[in-house]
């Protein structure tokens, strides 16, 4: 019975015809493994290969954010002990990007010498991108700043940083700079930059996670970016007390906006944030491994032609089951996050190589 239904929903997804009722039915009646299998078949029908696109970020401006997002350690309303600093210089941003390339080079050398333990699979070399004699496993580099928006001087510095990165590396550049106006978006379009602006939650649930800016503020930026033919990366953060229905609603809202890439973040509660206190007090129930995997699979089923990438909270929430998500993912964020530590690139590459060898 499940097999027949999988074939039915496979055909429907490939035609981009999955609706809300379908998605809710799948969540309620299919196991996480069954949903992953369905999403895996969808991904393989669409893509000629299963290469996982890796991206990394720099926290280019940290803390002192006047917004009150309940999950964020950079908000002035949180009590977190995090690094606080103004916008890094263009040279500092460039050097950070170069460190990522250097790390790829060192890993490549270790593979060639046979000293990278656990990387016996030849697929590890295959999942990279050609780059001056060695694979560049990290495809994208995103410049992220705290705050609702950046000022004109900060924007100029970031533009110059992007120009340097493009001149001196093969990295594709993304920017997460808050609420950008049309003129700034037009400048970024000239630089072939992908814009990042998370919805964070569904339209109906957004009021529960932030009051200092609106869901509509974010949608306005995304729509303006799409009008200018910019690529847009937009997703959300899950595990903030939202219902399954709200998670599914956001998928359809993102689909309607026509975003190109959808990052899935799962709450990693940080002591000092409002979300942490809500979990501690029992107001929010942490997301389970099964629910997280169902969510990832459903987003691929609902949006088969968008890039689904796993970002913040994957280590904390999926633990030993991260590799299961690789069945359906198009992308993965590697390295450190904004204020939390990630895994080293080498460990993630080993995980990907092991998956590709199955």
Swiss-Prot record:
Pathway: Cofactor biosynthesis; biotin biosynthesis; biotin from 7,8-diaminononanoate: step 2/2. Residues 47-306 form the Radical SAM core domain. HAMAP family: BioB. Binds 1 [4Fe-4S] cluster. The cluster is coordinated with 3 cysteines and an exchangeable S-adenosyl-L-methionine. InterPro entries: Aldolase_TIM, BATS_dom, Biotin_synth/BioAB, Biotin_synthase, Elp3/MiaA/NifB-like_rSAM, rSAM. It is an enzyme of class 2 (transferase). One of its GO terms (molecular function) is biotin synthase activity. This is Biotin synthase. [4Fe-4S] cluster binds at residues 65, 69, 72. Coiled coil: none annotated. It comes from the Archaea. GO terms for biological process: biotin biosynthetic process. Keywords: 2Fe-2S, 4Fe-4S, Biotin biosynthesis, Iron, Iron-sulfur, Metal-binding, S-adenosyl-L-methionine, Transferase. Its EC number is 2.8.1.6. Catalyzes the conversion of dethiobiotin (DTB) to biotin by the insertion of a sulfur atom into dethiobiotin via a radical-based mechanism. [2Fe-2S] cluster binds at residues 142, 174, 233, 309. Pfam families: BATS, Radical_SAM. It comes from Methanocaldococcus jannaschii (strain ATCC 43067 / DSM 2661 / JAL-1 / JCM 10045 / NBRC 100440) (Methanococcus jannaschii). Homodimer. It catalyses: (4R,5S)-dethiobiotin + (sulfur carrier)-SH + 2 reduced [2Fe-2S]-[ferredoxin] + 2 S-adenosyl-L-methionine = (sulfur carrier)-H + biotin + 2 5'-deoxyadenosine + 2 L-methionine + 2 oxidized [2Fe-2S]-[ferredoxin]. Its cofactor is [4Fe-4S] cluster; [2Fe-2S] cluster. Belongs to the radical SAM superfamily. Biotin synthase family.
